[in-house]
């Protein structure tokens, strides 16, 4: 602030959201994901949140520290079961996403970064983070969260009907798309 030195640094080899294919914005394709972190009290522990843009399906993982290594490990772990359905990933410019190249290579996906201070460019994920806060409020220490708590939150969020999905649940839409995608892949091989 006020001409001081920038302490956050930059993440090397970032690809701007401006270069992301237009099909992602139109929500026409299954397999475009947004990711972020939700910070617990004390700013140490975090939840990695990932959601598929078309279905609004959410994945959540707890990380003991918000490091690039921990976040990339969590993202890879969450998305590996769906690796054939991961085309793009979009995040903010947080340093926790510094290992974006490792994530992209492991999942065979393209990785994009939104503009700084432009949370609306990842609106679905920011909305999801607000819903996640219903289960894990800002003042909550995340070292008290169990995997069972996370699974319960994911289940509730993914089974909540959404107006934008024609009052279907994210789980219903995700499973339909996943099944359709797997059948398409099977027919191509």
Residue ranges and their predicted role:
Residues 1-47:
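Mobile-element integrase/transposase regions
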Residues 39-43, 60-83:
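Active-site beta-loop-alpha junctions of metal-dependent nucleic acid enzymes
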Residues 91-94, 98-101, 113-134, 143-155:
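RNase H-like two-metal-ion nuclease catalytic core shared by retroviral integrases
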Residues 106-107:
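Short, structured coil segments at secondary-structure junctions
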Residues 138-189:
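C-terminal domain-tail junction helix/linker
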Residues 56-61, 113, 138-140:
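Short small-residue beta-strand/loop micro-motif enriched in glycine and branched aliphatics
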Residues 36, 50, 56, 75, ...:
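Mobile genetic element proteins and their domesticated derivatives, centered on retroelements
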């Amino acid at each position: 602030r006020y001409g001081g030195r920038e302490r956050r640094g930059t993440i090397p080899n970032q690809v701007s959201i401006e270069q992301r294919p237009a099909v992602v914005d139109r929500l026409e394709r299954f397999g475009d994901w947004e990711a972020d972190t939700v910070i617990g009290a004390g700013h140490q522990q975090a939840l990695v949140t990932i959601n598929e843009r078309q279905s609004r399906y959410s994945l959540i993982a707890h990380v003991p520290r918000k490091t690039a290594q921990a976040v990339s490990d969590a993202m890879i772990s969450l998305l590996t079961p769906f690796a054939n359905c991961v085309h793009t990933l979009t995040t903010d410019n947080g340093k926790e996403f510094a290992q974006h190249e490792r994530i992209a290579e492991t999942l065979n996906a393209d990785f994009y970064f939104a503009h700084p201070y432009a949370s609306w460019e990842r609106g679905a994920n920011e909305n999801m983070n607000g819903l996640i806060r219903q289960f894990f409020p800002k003042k909550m220490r995340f070292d008290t969260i169990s995997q069972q708590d996370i699974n319960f939150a994911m289940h509730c969020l993914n089974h909540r009907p959404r107006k934008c999905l024609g009052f279907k649940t994210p789980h219903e839409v995700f499973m339909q798309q996943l099944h359709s995608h797997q059948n398409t892949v099977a027919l191509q091989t």
